[in-house]
Amino acid sequence: ITFRGALIEYIESEASIWELLAYVQMRALNIGTGGADHHEASIRDAIHRRASREDRATIKHEARAMRLRLERTHAARGRNVDIKFGAGGLLDVYFVVRYLLLLDLRAIAPEAMTTSARLDAFAAAGMLSAEDHAALHEGHGFLSTLDHSLRLAFGRSSRLPRANHPVM
């Protein structure tokens, strides 16, 4: 049995929904042995088969529970605003994308790897309304730009500095 075979077997028989939420982000690396696209496609198919055995409500519940757990354990405390882990932050957009991927991993092309490209593909496939697409796309764009700017100014932090911070 190969590593890929063992992984596929695990995904199809034992993987929990929270693991599938992580696995949908998996990408194959082509390090000279060839066949990376084939390996990635077979793993995506296994994720699709496994997720299709769950009903939408269960996937939604599990995705939300994991998102809230990350917020509780990582979000800024007190008066700080955390644009990644806090409510309304980047992870909200990422979890919507992962939830939609689990609903139908085959609805979008594997080449749609960025969050923006995936949101566009979900809208084109009718999985997101125009209103939801616009809100998610604009919010993601704004928060991504803000995150990049904060990293340039303050280093690796997803937390907005307080208004009375000396740097401000």
Show where each model-derived region lies.
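A nucleotide- and high-energy phosphate-metabolite-utilizing enzyme signature
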Residues: I1-M168
